[in-house]
Amino acid sequence: MNALVALVGRPNVGKSTLFNRLTRSRDALVVDQPGVTRDRKYGLAHYGEQSFFVVDTGGVMEQESGIGRLMRAQAQLAIEEADVIFFLVDGREGLSSLDEEIAAWLRCAQKPLKLVINKAEGRDGDLVASEFYRLGLGEPIIISAQQGQGVGRLLEALLTLLPVLEREESEIQAKGLQFAVIGRPNVGKSTLVNRILGEERVLSSEIPGTTRDSISIPFRHHGKDYTLVDTAGIRRRSRILDKVEKFSVIQSLQSIAIAQVVILVIDAHDSVVEQDLHLAGVILESGKGVVIAVNKWDGLPLEQRQRVKTDLDRRLPFLVFARIHFISALHGSGVGDLFPSIDEAYQSANSHLPTGELNRALLAAVEKYPPPVVKGRRIKLRYAHQGGQNPPKIIIHGNQAEAVSANYRRYLINYFRNAFGLMGTPIALEFRTVKNPFKGRANILTQRQQQKRKRLVRFRKGRD
């Protein structure tokens, strides 16, 4: 399971800038809920072969009670779940009393902690760091999140702080295909999970997962083994804030990271709302197989049903490859139909695409709809081969291949999807321009070619 890094500090010390630097502004998820979860950002970051989640806990503001309720409400859950804490301070403004108070609060968390001095560009590092040693948090890392200076050293330090999780994803004692049920509050996730497990009779007790209280619940459906991945953690519910209990984004991210296929549950009564779009985007970025379950479909008026279908097409065009099921988790209608789509998504995500068949499909696609002309020359796509699975990755080589437009990219993805029947999974395309080994080199003629050219010149002059 991927580790979690929490960014903590007072306002305007550069937490959001560092967040965007680490995540490259991808996978960012803003949960707009009143109270404890307002404007908390979550994202996935990569460094080398290491992946980890990042959470920006928001600024800690000074109040009469010191850190007070705002700090505990906004950051407590993220810090409790975090494996590592980055405590950001402002190198321009220097040490403040609020910094000292936050440092004392963080020490009580008893988590790996790294002091990060931001906004240090153009300043003497030793001089900037000197006053922060009094915090007693060890050697600080000096960075400029805006310019990227020192971020590499910070990430190297992070690798030494990341714990060895009790069991990695590959070590979870799970049976069969692993899938997760994801959705915003009150869409019927728990009802759907209970319906699935209640109907299929859980074969064994909950298997303890990693330090995140994740559980893997094996069961059998029509003679086939599955494992439901759940990171909600029954034990956690008794010790977290009520509002946070309803919707913890990091739990959803962890579920997505572990699962092979994700079921996105949408409430038919509300149709597609912003939180649905956020979660759908996170699932898409993860590259996992996906199935959409529109819950509470029973009893919905015909006019409202049509409106929901229209919203699905209009607001989720980037998940056009996902099978959509209209279900009632409460009454069980349509729940059994989810399993063929789960299987299909998994098989598609792990498909082996023979090179010969890929090239024939590429040739047919290009003949049907040639690539556009760029700078007076038509793009030539010459050959393709598979570059990975889960999701399927297709590498296409050609001339000016990097100039392929987004529209033509979508056309090729849809063509490959139809040609190979890849439903329930995204498809990744990578274009590589074939390098011309003679580009930039003078065309030097051999002696024989030079003599031939002279004869042609004399011949043309003789005709004139």
Swiss-Prot record:
InterPro entries: G_ENGA, GTP-bd, GTPase_Der, KH_dom-like, KH_dom-like_a/b, P-loop_NTPase, Small_GTP-bd. Residues 351-435 form the KH-like domain. It comes from the Bacteria. The keyword Repeat applies. GTP 1 binds at residues 9-16, 56-60, 118-121. It comes from Nitrosococcus oceani (strain ATCC 19707 / BCRC 17464 / JCM 30415 / NCIMB 11848 / C-107). GTPase that plays an essential role in the late steps of ribosome biogenesis. GTP 2 binds at residues 183-190, 230-234, 295-298. Keywords: GTP-binding, Nucleotide-binding, Repeat, Ribosome biogenesis. Belongs to the TRAFAC class TrmE-Era-EngA-EngB-Septin-like GTPase superfamily. EngA (Der) GTPase family. SUPFAM superfamilies: P-loop containing nucleoside triphosphate hydrolases. The keyword Metal-binding does not apply. The lineage of its organism: Bacteria, Pseudomonadati, Pseudomonadota, Gammaproteobacteria, Chromatiales. Residues 3-166, 177-350 form the EngA-type G domain. HAMAP family: GTPase_Der. Pfam families: KH_dom-like, MMR_HSR1. One of its GO terms (molecular function) is GTP binding. GO terms for biological process: ribosome biogenesis. Associates with the 50S ribosomal subunit. This is GTPase Der.
